[in-house]
Curated annotation (Swiss-Prot):
The gene is COG6. InterPro entries: COG6, COG6_C, COG6_N. This is Conserved oligomeric Golgi complex subunit 6. It is found in: Golgi apparatus membrane. It is a peripheral membrane protein.
Length: 775
């Protein structure tokens, strides 16, 4: 606890008022134990300091003498300070202000600690009990100083008592610590004895460890040398058995394992070449080079022997070994290509010999039980009566060869499912390449045989049947073969060329027929007075249309769009052109225009009747319908002219058309007023025309039917009669209106309805008249 020294001997002046201070008495009391502990520490330090000083001073001086001297000096200093204080009492107000400030600082340090009000109240209550006379405490003289010192002593006495009670609480702990002191001393003694023994044993152990370390180093060195020797033997040497396996052992999994090891040793020898003396590496490399080369030769011989005798692959073990050989050789393309070339040559010669023997009928030679040969019960015989069967049998045989070779090569070069996908793709390419090279050897022979048949055949039906067979087998071959543009003798390309040859042959035959017909005199002489189509067109379509009808593709024989259009033009338009040329050149017959039109109509009608059921010719049907319409219109105009001339109205018809041609959409009588200026337009001529009309029209229908009797199509005849009669009646009606307008006493004898009845078109005319316009 902090105490206040307020020794002042001034009586007249009172200190200046100061702000209220909080006195943290309780907190100082609580911290008193800590202060005592600090005091104890200070005392220990002083004692240690004194002990050090005792070493320096002489041994005759005692500690009590030094302490007495020190406290005497402190007392003298205190007296001197008191004298100085008495002198300072007479100083100015500034010094009193400093004293007051010092007092305030002390009070603030003591009272500013935060404490509960109840604790402050209790502290001051206890302090009040100690204070007997407050006036004596605040006196500035000696009496006040003694009173304050007395109060201080009482407070300190209470604090000492309080601290003593607190120290009593630690007495059991101190007692226990005293008991532990003896045990600790015993333990320290045991520790010292054990430490001494350990130190003695440490030296002996140290010597033993040194000896063990030397032995371990020696052992490690020996193990290292042993490991190096074993590693060298494993990496750079083969045992006797492994050398025997490579040189004389059976080719199997063990053989390839040893061979792989041998190759690794050969590769690792490059390390030995980098040492100072490379002779050892060179010797090892030379030895293993010989072993590897001999092993490769054994693998090549085994592979060639196995591939030449495919019947030896009847076991899974043999096939697996062959796959391992091929996989090993695949890494050495020069050896692999040599093996494949030998195999391809052998198989190619075999299938060519078998093919020729089948064609030539020599079954004894083809049945010599060679590996992978295809046996047939009968030869393929070319028959002049049935070339389609010959080509069918030939293509069937080729297809069986293709399937057999594909399956054989796939079984030989196919890999197991355990292989990865990259190897699968790689071997698939090899299978396709080998199969194609073997089968391509047949391309020349097959092409020559089939082209020989195609070239010698002249029947369209036969050529088309051959085309269908070749086209069918092209699709079948495409499933097993790949087309290669680099190989000119690719079998699939050869078959496609045969398809083109058959297409060209069909087109060539048709062109030759048309050329022959065009230049044939007999074809021109077939034009006669019955106006019927010539026989050559019937024969022409009897050969061509059946094969077109058999076609199922979008274009004929899968021709391109342009070629298909040219072909259709050749079989439809070209005959029409030839027929028209025949009509124009046939002057001896002296066909009039009507007969020529009827001939053309009958010709087109025949073509339409032939091609109508064929869907592939639907575009040409529309084109022929347009031509028929044009010819029908021309014949209708001729028939109209015949009716007008029969009624002797041709001059009037020409005059009216010169003024303004008739139209169904518009008619005005006033437009034709200039006709009155013509001398022919008179009452006498109209009366004469009536007489002729009266005699001609009753039998005109029979005359028309008789003139169209040679037209083959009843529909065309009916349309021509109806249209020509309607046109005549329209002219008759309009001409009668003109007469009525400009000739007062003249008129045609019959009305338009009566004329329509005479011509047999009353009902159609009634419907047509409704759409006519008269102004």
């Amino acid at each position: 606890m902090d105490f206040i020294d307020f020794d002042s001997f001034q009586q007249d002046e009172i200190p200046q008022p100061q702000p209220a201070l909080s006195l943290p008495i309780t907190s100082n009391i609580e911290n008193l134990g800590k202060r005592f502990s600090n005091f104890n520490s200070l005392t220990k330090n002083l004692l240690k300091f004194d002990e050090k000083d005792d070493i320096k001073v002489d041994g005759d001086e005692s500690e009590e003498t030094k302490l007495a001297e020190k406290y005497a000096n402190l007392s003298l200093n205190l007296i001197n300070s008191l004298e100085d204080d008495n002198e300072e009492e007479n100083e100015s107000d500034l010094n009193r202000s400093k004293t007051t400030t010092t007092l305030s600082t002390r009070l603030s340090r003591v009272l500013n600690n935060s404490m509960p009000d109840s604790l402050v109240r209790e502290i001051f209550a206890n302090l009040d009990l100690k204070i007997e006379n407050i006036a004596a405490l605040v006196e500035p003289g000696i009496t006040g100083s003694n009173s304050r010192k007395k109060l201080r002593g009482e407070i300190e006495n209470d604090l000492i008592k309080t601290q003593g009670l607190m120290l009593k609480e630690y007495q059991p702990v101190i007692k226990n610590l005293s008991n532990l002191e003896n045990d600790l001393k015993n333990l320290n003694g045991l520790r010292d004895s054990i430490t001494e023994k350990v130190n003695k044993d440490f030296q002996s152990t140290k010597d033993l460890n040194g000896e063990v370390k030397n032995l371990n180093d020696t052992k490690s060195l020996i193990n290292l040398k042993k490991g190096l020797l074993i590693s060298f033997q494993n990496k750079f040497a083969l045992d006797v058995y492994e050398e025997y396996v490579l040189q004389n052992g059976e080719i199997n999994d063990e053989f390839f394992q040893v061979l792989i090891k041998c190759e690794k040793i050969h590769e690792n020898c490059s390390i030995l070449l980098s040492v100072d003396n490379p002779q050892l590496g060179l010797k090892i490399m030379s030895k293993f080079n010989q072993l590897i080369n001999k092993s490769v030769e054994r693998i090549i011989n085994f592979t060639n022997k196995t591939l030449n005798n495919l019947y030896s692959l009847n076991t899974t073990t043999k096939l697996t070994t062959l796959h391992q050989c091929l996989k090993f050789l695949r890494k050495r393309l020069n050896y692999f290509n040599t093996v494949i070339d030998n195999f391809v040559d052998t198989r190619s010669r075999l299938i060519i010999d078998e093919f020729l023997n089948q064609i030539n009928g020599d079954l004894d030679k083809s049945g010599d039980n060679r590996s992978g040969s295809i046996q047939h019960d009968r030869p393929i015989i070319l028959s002049a009566h049935d070339p389609v069967r010959f080509i069918g049998d030939l293509l069937a045989y080729i297809h069986s060869v293709v399937v057999n070779e594909t399956e054989t090569i796939s079984s030989i070069f196919g890999i197991s499912k355990e292989e990865n996908e990259d190897d699968d793709i790689e071997y698939k390419d090899i299978i396709d390449d080998v199969t194609g090279r073997i089968l391509n050897s047949l391309s020349r022979s097959v092409k020559s045989k089939i082209e020989q048949v195609i070239t010698s055949e002249t029947k369209l039906a036969t050529i088309y049947a051959i085309y269908s067979l070749v086209e069918l087998y092209t699709i079948m071959f495409a499933k097993h073969l790949k087309e290669s543009s680099n190989d000119k003798h690719n079998l699939l390309m050869t078959v496609r060329e045969l398809v083109s040859s058959s297409q060209n042959k069909i087109i060539s035959i048709i062109q030759n027929k048309l050329t022959t017909i065009k230049s044939s005199n007999s074809a021109q002489l077939e034009l006669n007075t019955d106006l019927q189509p010539p026989e050559w067109i019937i024969e022409f379509y009897s050969d061509i249309l059946p094969i077109i009808d058999q076609n199922t593709s979008d274009t004929f024989m899968n021709l391109s769009t342009e070629n298909n259009a040219e072909f259709m033009k050749m079989i439809i338009n070209k005959p029409i052109e030839i027929f028209n040329e025949h009509i124009e050149n046939n002057i001896s017959k002296l066909f009039n225009r009507r007969d020529q039109v009827i001939l053309k109509l009958n010709f087109l009608d025949l073509i339409l009747s032939k091609i109508m059921p064929i869907i592939l010719l639907s575009d040409k049907i529309l084109e022929l319908n347009d031509l028929t319409e044009k010819l029908s219109l021309e014949l209708t105009n001729l028939q109209l002219d015949s009716l007008i001339s029969g009624c002797q109205l041709t001059n009037f018809y020409n005059i009216i058309n010169m003024i303004c041609p008739f139209s169904d959409d518009f008619f005005d009588v006033s437009i034709y007023q200039p006709i009155t200026e013509n001398k022919l337009f008179s009452e006498d001529n109209i009366i004469a025309a009536n007489d002729i009309i009266q005699n001609f029209l009753p039998s005109a229908l029979l005359d028309i039917q008789q003139s169209l009797f040679k037209v083959n199509s009843p529909m065309i005849v009916n349309n021509i009669i109806t249209n020509s009669s309607l046109e005549f009646i329209k002219f008759y009606l309009k001409f009668n209106l003109i007469i009525n307008e400009y000739l007062d006493d003249a008129s045609l004898i019959w009305s338009d309805i009566e004329v329509a009845t005479l011509l047999g078109v009353e009902e159609p005319y009634q419907q047509t008249k409704k759409s006519m316009s008269f102004d």
